[in-house]
Structures are given as structure tokens and as C-alpha cells.
Regions:
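Helix-to-loop junction immediately C-terminal to a conserved catalytic motif
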Residues: 52
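Conserved catalytic motifs of ABC-family nucleotide-binding domains
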Residues: 158
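Conserved ABC ATPase signature
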Residues: 137-141, 145-147
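The feature captures the beta-strand-to-loop junction immediately N-terminal to the Walker
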Residues: 37-39
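Catalytic Walker B motif of ABC-type/P-loop ATPase nucleotide-binding domains
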Residues: 162-165
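Conserved ABC transporter NBD signature motif
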Residues: 60-68, 80
Length: 223
């Protein structure tokens, strides 16, 4: 599902050059749940951005879901992203749209037949326990509810890969546990998951393979 070979990422040039990632190599099998951990600034977000081609690597090869991401043409990026669901630390919901409309919007962009949009959107909301809040607007949601909506939006297109970038970073322990449980439920249905977190207390609860970044380098791969 994911393969990185000797991937490095450098920002800037000359004396101001900063190495965000250095010589990263690993493989994630289809259906695997991988925890990407490390302190803030270790390179976790940069690595995820490379996977969905928000950034291009300075060196190395990246393959994701059958796409040669490092050589992908700009016109092919939307095809890659159709196979990936993404959840951020900030839910990034559209402020002027209801929870249902936020989720359904993804399907409309993908050209889903109109008759399929409503049942698929409600199925995604049901999966994250948010059906009762379908007509609420983002400003009416708690932080936990907003992340549930973000998760529903990520899974509504039935992606083969879910990238979760610090989705529990702004949540208290109880809410974080709920989101974590939902992500594990999604994984149990066959979705490959890469879950990034700097919260060391979460890692033992996940009990999954762990990749640890420090200073832009992969220093541990275990589990």
C-alpha cells in the first residue's frame, strides 16, 4: 500500500536550508495499522503531506496505492487523493455548511450519482455516531463532534488508506479515546491506517506497529 525508499525532504536553499526528513525508508502493507510517532517538529506532518502529494520529495521514491507519487503529474494528483481519506488536527470543516453538507460535498466533487449521495453521507455519519448532529453547523459542535464529522468526511468515499494527522491533539483524554476507537473500527473493516501522534500516552493503547521519527530521521520501527 505504501513504500518509501531513501526519501529526503529539504526546505529552502543555501545557508537557510532545513532538512525536514532524511533518508526515510519503510513499507506499509495493505490493511495494516501503523502509528507514526515522535515529538512535535519531528517530521510527521511533512511525511504525511508527501504521501498525499501536498509536497514532493527532494530525493527518493514514494509509492502509494499503486501510484508512483514522487513522479506523479499534477493532473494525476486528484486520482491519488480519491483513494485516500485524510483527517487533520484541525477538523477543517466548511463553516457555512451543515455537518451533512460537509460530508456530502466530498461525494458531489467526486461526481457521485445524486441518488447515492444522501444514503452514503448518512452511512458515514452513522459510522462515527453523529447522525443526530447532521443538520448542525460547525460552530455548534464540540471539538470531539467536529473531529467525528471530519472522520465521516474522510471515510465517505470508502478510501483504501486513511491518514490521520494528530486527530486527537486538541482533545481531552475521553474524547481522544473515542476518536481512537472510531479509527480502529475503520481499520477493522479493511482500511489501511497511518495514525500520527506526538501523544506518547496513546501509543500503548494502540498496540500496533510503531514508526518513530526524531529530527527528521526514522529511529525506530517496531511491533
Amino acid at each position: 500500500m505504501i513504500r518509501l525508499q531513501h526519501v529526503s525532504m529539504v526546505f529552502g536553499a543555501g545557508p537557510s536550508q532545513v532538512a525536514a526528513l532524511t533518508d526515510i525508508s519503510f513499507h506499509v502493507a495493505k490493511g495494516e495499522f501503523v502509528v507514526l510517532t515522535g515529538p512535535s517538529g519531528a517530521g510527521k506532518t511533512t511525511l504525511l503531506r508527501l504521501l498525499y502529494r501536498a509536497e514532493s520529495p527532494s530525493e527518493g521514491d514514494i509509492d502509494v496505492a499503486g501510484f508512483d507519487v514522487s513522479a506523479l503529474r499534477r493532473s494525476e494528483i486528484p486520482r491519488l487523493r480519491r483513494s485516500i481519506g485524510i483527517v487533520f488536527q484541525d477538523a477543517k470543516l466548511l463553516a457555512g455548511r451543515t455537518v451533512f453538507e460537509n460530508v456530502a460535498f466530498v461525494l458531489r466533487v467526486l461526481g457521485t450519482p445524486r441518488r447515492e449521495i444522501t444514503p452514503k453521507a448518512f452511512a458515514a455519519l452513522k459510522a462515527v455516531g453523529l447522525s443526530a448532529r447532521a443538520q448542525a453547523f460547525p460552530h455548534q459542535l464540540s471539538q470531539g463532534e467536529a473531529q467525528r464529522a471530519s472522520l465521516a468526511r474522510a471515510i465517505v468515499k470508502s478510501p483504501g488508506l486513511l491518514l490521520a494527522d494528530e486527530p486527537t491533539g486538541n482533545l481531552d483524554e475521553e474524547m481522544a479515546g473515542e476518536i481512537l476507537g472510531l479509527v480502529k473500527d475503520i481499520w477493522s473493516r479493511g482500511t489501511t491506517v497511518v495514525f500520527a501522534t506526538h501523544q506518547a500516552r496513546l501509543v500503548p493503547h494502540l498496540r500496533r506497529r510503531t514508526l518513530r521519527l526524531e529530527g527528521g530521521r526514522l529511529v525506530k520501527d517496531e511491533g
